[in-house]
A protein has these predicted regions:
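Short amphipathic beta-strand starts and helix->beta connectors
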Residues: 38-44, 88-98, 125-127, 165-172
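Acidic, proline/glycine-enriched N-terminal capping motif
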Residues: 1-89, 94, 210
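Conserved small/polar residues in nucleotide/adenosyl-binding loops
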Residues: 217-223
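Acidic, low-complexity central loop/insert segments
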Residues: 64, 100-216
Length: 227
């Protein structure tokens, strides 16, 4: 059995007594205080999720025509600083992965499911699209919940829904997969623990992937295999 990959927050999760599981080849927190309790954190207040197992690729804006050809949405005409949910398809029209694009003036951030990251990278390689893999040099933290935006507003600029923003060391979008409002923040690994500690001082609770799965299943949100 191959060794599981870990995010930069692995030791942090252990210090929080998280229940760790094998999730698409990554050792990830399933729960901290219990799945149902964490689900209610998000529904009633705010929680944060480590979703750094998800693939993060930076692509040059100059390749947008070629990228547009590979997905089932119109990316090239999307306004800059917007986020787009889409699906990469094969030549036969089958789904390879459901993904999120964050569009900026000079580049694109592509976020894909952990189980399909290598498939997406291979698909891009085959189609001669170059990218920078940020998966191991950054973390991705989702802050979600009824009060999430009020809390985040104390820390950073709040973009419109489905919009993106760059500020200081943060690259983020007002997106998520729980059915509640919030943001997903990409941040250098060296800064993540300080960022999370700041969230916790404002009452944001750690939540595992179990409660995240409950949230999107409860709302019948789609996902390609596992995230």
């Amino acid at each position: 059995m191959s060794e599981l990959k870990t995010t930069s927050l692995y030791d942090f999760h252990l210090s929080k007594k998280a229940k760790m599981i094998d999730f698409a080849g990554w050792s990830m927190p399933f729960s901290y205080d219990g799945t149902l309790k964490e689900h209610h954190y998000v529904r009633n207040s705010a929680g944060y999720f480590d979703v750094s197992h998800m693939g993060r690729l930076r692509l040059s804006y100059s390749q947008i025509e070629e990228i547009n050809y590979l997905i089932c949405s119109e990316l090239k005409n999307l306004e800059n600083t917007k986020a787009l949910y889409s699906i990469f398809t094969s030549e036969q029209g089958t789904a390879i992965d459901d993904v999120i694009f964050w569009k900026f003036e000079d580049d694109l951030i592509l976020i894909c499911n952990a189980s399909n990251t290598n498939k997406i990278k291979s698909h891009l390689d085959i189609n001669s699209i170059t990218y920078e893999d940020l998966t191991l040099t950054t973390d991705l933290i989702a802050i979600q919940g009824k009060n999430a935006i009020n809390i985040i507003d104390q820390i950073m600029t709040i973009p419109d829904k489905f919009s993106t923003y760059k500020e200081n060391n943060y690259i983020y979008a007002r997106t998520g997969y729980t059915g509640e409002d919030g943001v997903e923040v990409m941040i250098d690994t060296k800064d993540t623990v300080d960022f999370i500690n700041m969230l916790e001082t404002k009452g944001v609770k750690p939540c595992g992937l179990g409660s995240r799965a409950v949230s999107y299943t409860h709302l019948t949100l789609p996902t390609t295999q596992v995230v």
